Amino acid sequence: DPEMSRGLGDVYKRQIPNYHYEDCKRLLDMYEQKNLKNPAAIIDANHSNSNKQYKEQLRIVSEVLHTRNYDPKLKKLIKGVMVESYLVEGRQDIGGNMVYGKSITDPCIGWEDTVRLIDKIAEDC
C-alpha cells in the first residue's frame, strides 16, 4: 500500500508540512534502506500540508508535480495526490439554509478549481 504523506504536528500542535522535495527525498531514502520492491507515496495536499488552508492545495499540487518532474526516482515513487474537492468551495455547518454541494466536514476547493487542477496534472504528467 502507498504511504500517505499528510503532514505532521509537533509537540505544540503546530502543523508541519512534509510534501517538499527534501521530504519526498527523505521518504525515498527510507524506502531504499528497507529494500522495498514497490515503494509508493500519495501526497495529501490538504490537512497539515496546507495548514488547513484549502486553497493552498493548488500550489502544493504544483510543487509536487515539479518535484516529480525534477527527479526520476521521485516520479516513480509519488503515485498521486489527495485533494479535498467538492462542487462548491469552502465548508458549512449542518442546519439552516444549507448549500447543495458544499462540504459539511473539511473545507474543499470548488468545481472550477478542481477542473483546472486536473487539467494541470494531466499536462504535467
Language-model regions: role of each:
Residues 14-15, 46-50, 81-88:
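Active-site beta-loop-alpha junctions enriched in small/polar residues
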Residues 64-91:
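Substrate-binding cleft of secreted/luminal carbohydrate-active enzymes
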Residues 20-36, 64, 68-70:
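Structured alpha-helical segments in the cores of large, soluble enzyme domains
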